Amino acid sequence: MTGFMKGAMILTVAGLLVKVIGAISKVIVARILGGEGVGLYQMAYSLYQLIISIGAAGLPVAISIMIARKVGQEDFRGARHIFKVALTTMGIIGVLLSIGFYLAIPYVIEVGLITDSRAEGALLAVAPAIGIVSLLACFRGYFQGFQNMLPTGISQVCEQLGRVLVMVGAAIYFLPQGIELASSRAALSSVIGVGLGLVVLLYYYGRESKLEGQVYSLESPSKIIQELIVLALPVALANIMIPLIGAIDLWLVPQQLMLSGYGKEEATTAFGYLTGMATSLISLPVIVTMSLATSLVPAISRLHRERDQEEIHHRMRTALRMTNIVTIPAFVGLCVLATPISQMMFNTPNAGGAIAVLSASIWLLGVQQVTTGALQGLGHTAIPMFTLLLGAILKILLNLYLTPQWGIEGAAWATNVDFGIAAIANVYILYRSTSFQVSFIEIGKILFSSLAM
């Protein structure tokens, strides 16, 4: 098994474990704190996730690209120099972000961005985690640059496990003292979780044998920081685009449903079928494709540095083949069995239509993720941001037209077009830049086999 596939497998297993642990914790915490307590916790946690997605989301990709290039030259000293500069820079930025977040909390509540002032304690609790996440991202990017996904995978599981155990324990222990205190102490779990993840990565870093390799002159810190920004910023912007479009949908889709004759409660219910039920089902298979994309970035980056076009094509073909093998049967199966699955999992058959339509996004999003990984590995980190933006603009326009015509299924079709346009644009740009061609015969065979089952 190649290092690329081994890395993807490790990240897939870790991703599934994180999902399972997270799903179990949601049920337990909801039973302990109830809707009110969970709401206070989520107000803080959602804002925290938005901040770290802006501040640190692009770092692992950017650092892994820069490290992989040095590893391809056997310049291990240069790779460690890049890591140390990135770690120092992000350590300082992380501390400043944490302090800024802490000081901004009263104003965030005052202007109404957080509508319940009782969430202040939970917001204060998550502030230190922002600084730690910046360091965590640097370490993960470093190991990914060496195509060593084990530290990243184990740290993700430990982070989630630590967060969940502290969250549940704090919720149980502090609930008798009031829902506000219980939710704020449960929010401390974010700090404990990322802290535990960082300890795991420090352990692996300490164990690592420091290879010397070839000796090259070291780049200046300013040049490293400049390249880091150029690579990381588009990735961070692309990462926040999907939740941003989700926020637009939150306002736009129910409004369009009501314009077509839905009552307020009916529109909210239909929106729940799409975002709370259908979306949750498509998120599981794409764990595999996200892992493939993450593992693909440093592999392609290293090969691109070595100008090994044939091996680049081989890695991309392998990644897309695995994507098709996993996502096409999942898409077909979910589409055909949408209504029974809706009844079994959500105790209503009414989400079946939205699930059936949105199931196509399993394949489309999978292709978009893997081709994004390939483009990032080639150094084109800005392109996936623009292809996602193009898809998002079309999605908004189609929501305005299709949702009043076809109801919630129209909104699901708009989402399919969003991911589909981004995927097609990525594939086209890969063809133009590397002459890589997708095997439509292979896709047809997998689709036919899936339909025949």
Predicted regions and their residues:
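Helix-loop junctions and terminal segments of transmembrane helices
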Residues: 57-72, 282-310, 316-320
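Alpha-helical transmembrane segments of multi-pass membrane proteins
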Residues: 99, 103, 114-138, 332, ...
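Membrane-water interface segments that mark the loop-to-transmembrane alpha-helix transition
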Residues: 62-106, 121-122, 313-327
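Membrane-interface junctions at transmembrane-helix termini in multi-pass inner-membrane proteins
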Residues: 133-155, 360-390, 401
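Transmembrane alpha-helical segments of multi-pass transport proteins
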Residues: 239, 244, 441-453
